Amino acid sequence: KWLYGVDDCRGAAYRTNLGLKPEDNYINNGVLLIDLEAWRKNKVEDMFLQYIRENQGDITFVDQGVQNGVLSKLGRSGILHPKYNCMTVFFAFDYKNLIKLRKPPVPGDSMQYQEAVKNPAIVHFQSCFRMSIRPWVVGCKHPYAKTYLEYKAKSPWKETPMMPDDRTVPQKMLSVVTSIMPESLMVSSISFVHTKIYPLARNLKQRINK
């Protein structure tokens, strides 16, 4: 393997839109373990550039799409334990609802998921409609926001002021509405958009651009 990362828990369409099979690995690019020697020897950068040209630069999730579209297709990517890239969505949903929400073709191990949330090695503060803002933004409710601020206070950036919440009105409305919806209704509604509507829209856009 030339690249390892944590499974991003995405539906089949996110893979097939990249030319992958539904069961192929699809990893998140937040934390990566790279075999640099193999990377250079096999000219992976050139492969990436060729893939970008072939798709006119229009690739879902940009660099994440490129790395999966190239290396997963070659069978050169592997999966790490989720504790090494414990994403915000892991904290926002329990395992059962995360699988219902994302509908991955090959669900990750539930015990590993629970272990990651309980004892993460690396916390990835990513965007998530349920916890939309990061800990350097005023009002963050992430369970590790306090820990982040404790380490920030010990860093050279301790005097850097907190950023304001600059989400758009629709983004804030989505966060509020989904927080008051019944859990099952919210999960099924967002799942339909996430696994069907968004990938379909991206696929149509890419076809038009080609």
Functional labels for PLM-detected ranges:
Residues K1-N17:
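Conserved donor-nucleotide/metal-binding helix-loop-beta segment in metal-dependent transferases, i.e.
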Residues N17-G19, D109:
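Eukaryotic intrinsically disordered and solvent-exposed regulatory patches
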Residues L20-V31:
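A recurrent flexible, glycine/aromatic-enriched loop bordering the glycosyltransferase active site
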Residues N29, I34-K210:
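A glycosyltransferase accessory/donor-loop signature
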